[in-house]
Amino acid sequence: MKILRKNHPLLKIVNHSFIDLPTPSNISSWWNFGSLLGMCLVIQILTGLFLAMHYTSDTTTAFSSVAHICRDVNYGWLIRYLHANGASMFFICLFIHVGRGIYYGSYVLSETWNIGIILLLTTMATAFVGYVLPWGQMSFWGATVITNLLSAIPYIGNTLVEWIWGGFSVDKATLTRFFAFHFILPFIIAAFALVHLLFLHETGSNNPSGLNSDSDKIPFHPYYTTKDLLGIFLLLLVLMILALFFPDVLGDPDNFTPANPLNTPAHIKPEWYFLFAYAILRSIPNKLGGVLALVLSILILAAFPLLNTSKQHGLIFRPVTQVIYWIFIANLLVLTWIGGQPVEYPFTTIGQIASVTYFATIIILIPVSNTIENNIIKL
C-alpha cells in the first residue's frame, strides 16, 4: 500500500497533499478550520443535491415545494435544516479561518491569501442566491434590495439590473437563474479550494510562532488527520444540535410568509453572516458610495499583504497590534448587531462610527502600530 500511494499517479497527489505532507509540528487548533470548511462544503453539496431533487424553481410553487420537502419527503425536514444551518456553520468557520490568517500573518502567502478572498466572495454570492430560493418575504425583498444596488453603477447600472432580473422586477426568470447559479457555484468553490490548497502546499503552512519551521516538520498523517477528525466531530455535533433543537434560530420569521410584492416587510435584512457588510452599506447616505463601501469591506482584505511593514511575522509577539486586532473583531461584532437593527437613531450613528473604525483599523491603525513596534525593536 505504501509503495502504491507513493508511485500511483493519482494516489501520489493525495499522498503529497494529505498523508506525507510535511507540516509544522506546532500548529494549533486554529489551523483546523481549513479542513472544517472542506467538510462544510461536502455537507452543503450533498444536502443541496437531495433538496434540488424535490425543489421547483417557479414562483408559484417554490414556497410550497420547500413546505413539501419538510412535510412529505423522508427526513426532508432534516436535510433542509442541515443545509440552512450548515451555511451558518460554513460562515462561522470562514470568519474564524480569515481571522486566524490575519492574527498569525498568513497573508504573507499572497497567492493563497488572494485565492482565499475569491473563495470568500464566491461563497457569499452562493449564500445570497440560495437565500432567495425558498421564496419567502425576506427572500423576495432581500433579492430586490441587493440586486437593485447594481443600478448605482454609472451608465450600465439599470441595464445590468434588468439583465440580472430577466425582466422589470424580481420574478420567475430571476428565481430560475438564481437556482442555476446556486447549483453550479459550490462546484466552482470546490475547484477554487483545490487551487487554494495547491498554492498553500507550494509554500508550506504558516505556524503560530511565525518562525521558519523547515527544520521541525512532521507528516500530516496520522498526527493532523486525527486532530482534524476531532474538529469534524465537534462541528457535526454543533450542527446537529442546531438542526435538531434550534432549527430556525438563525433564520428570519418573515420567511415563513410566501413572497408578496405588494407588502414590504418592516425591516429588510439579509442573513446574519452578511449583517456586518449590510451595516457598512447602510451607513453611507449615498447609494453608489454605499455599494463601493460594501465591496471594499471584503476586498480590503487584499490590502493586508501590501500594508504589512512589520519585521515580525504574525501578532504573537506584538502586544500593540494585538490590542488593535481585538478592537477590530469587537467592531465587527458591533457592525453585525447594527446590521440587524432598524434605520433610526442611535443605530445609524453607531453604524457610521463602526464603519469608519473598520476601515481605519486596517488602513491606518495596523500600519502605524507596525512602525511603532519596528522602532521598539531597534531600541
Swiss-Prot record:
One of the record's GO molecular function terms: metal ion binding
Binding-site residues for heme b b562, renumbered to this chain: H83, H182
Cofactor binding: number and manner: Binds 2 heme b groups non-covalently.
CDD domains attached to this UniProt entry: cytochrome_b_C, Cytochrome_b_N
Binding site for heme b b566: H97, H196
UniProt GO BP: mitochondrial electron transport, ubiquinol to cytochrome c
Function: Component of the ubiquinol-cytochrome c reductase complex (complex III or cytochrome b-c1 complex) that is part of the mitochondrial respiratory chain. The b-c1 complex mediates electron transfer from ubiquinol to cytochrome c. Contributes to the generation of a proton gradient across the mitochondrial membrane that is then used for ATP synthesis.
Miscellaneous comment text of the record: Heme 1 (or BL or b562) is low-potential and absorbs at about 562 nm, and heme 2 (or BH or b566) is high-potential and absorbs at about 566 nm.
UniProt protein name: Cytochrome b
Gene (UniProt): MT-CYB
